[in-house]
């Protein structure tokens, strides 16, 4: 299977629009949106009436059982992230957005009221019908975006079977989700624009792809809009 990854570096260059055009003109039946922070390729890609959605479990998060908590406050004093605070009634609770899952609270709690649970950090969707479309969405304030991108690609490849071509819409930037999306692709197409930031981010992507040993090509978009 040939795997075409479409990236941009700078946001707003027309990456997703270009990806949608490639999907249509190539007649691609295996498609993925790996922009897990803000997936939107599905808005311009129809023909997938059936959806199978599963939870994505990311890092651990602390929980405090209020029935066991004795209100000693040791967990709150030891938490360097300020994720534990009084919750009323002499009990303590965890702010899931602040918690880093280090597990220190579970070690210092004298009654075992604190525990670590796998956090549902997002959702993974596989749509089918006129082909296969995989995407995902990360919940606000969650990490593990690179891991979720890997899960999206794995779901696509498993469902695509013997398809000859897969087109993947990556995320902007050069961070973890972009690095994860580059793994194993045949070619990375960088959609850029003739602006200072567009050119600079394109150069960063080319260097990143070179380190990952991924071939690159460049599409200069919006040439008559941002001369």
Segments and roles (model prediction):
Residues 3-5, 28-30, 165-167:
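Residue-level preference for the first positions of well-ordered beta-strands
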Residues 29-42, 117-124:
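Short beta-strand-centered segment that lines the nucleotide-binding/catalytic pocket of NTP-utilizing
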Residues 74-94, 104-119:
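Iron-sulfur cluster-binding cysteine motifs and their immediate structural context
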Residues 83-91, 95-100, 106, 138-177:
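Phosphate-binding/switch loop-helix module in NTP-utilizing enzymes
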């Amino acid at each position: 299977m040939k795997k075409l990854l479409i990236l941009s570096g700078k946001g707003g260059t027309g990456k997703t629009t270009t990806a949608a055009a490639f999907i249509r003109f190539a007649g691609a039946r295996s498609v993925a949106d790996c922009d897990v922070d803000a997936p939107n390729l599905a808005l311009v890609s129809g023909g997938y009436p059936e959806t199978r959605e599963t939870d994505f479990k990311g890092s651990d998060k602390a929980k405090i059982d209020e029935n066991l908590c004795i209100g000693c406050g040791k967990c709150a004093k030891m938490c360097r992230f300020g994720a534990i605070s009084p919750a009323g009634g002499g009990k303590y609770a965890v702010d899931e957005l602040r918690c880093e899952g280090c597990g220190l609270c579970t070690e210092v709690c004298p009654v075992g009221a604190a525990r670590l649970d796998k956090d549902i950090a997002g959702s993974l969707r596989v749509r089918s019908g006129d082909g296969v479309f995989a995407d995902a969405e990360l919940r606000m304030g969650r990490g593990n975006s690179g891991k979720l991108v890997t899960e999206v690609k794995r779901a696509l490849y498993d469902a695509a079977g013997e398809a000859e071509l897969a087109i993947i819409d990556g995320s902007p930037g050069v961070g973890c989700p972009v690095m994860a999306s580059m793994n194993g692709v045949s070619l990375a197409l960088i959609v850029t624009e003739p602006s200072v930031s567009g050119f600079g981010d394109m150069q960063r992507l080319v260097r990143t792809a070179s380190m990952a040993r991924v071939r690159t090509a460049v599409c200069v978009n919006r040439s008559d809009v941002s001369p």
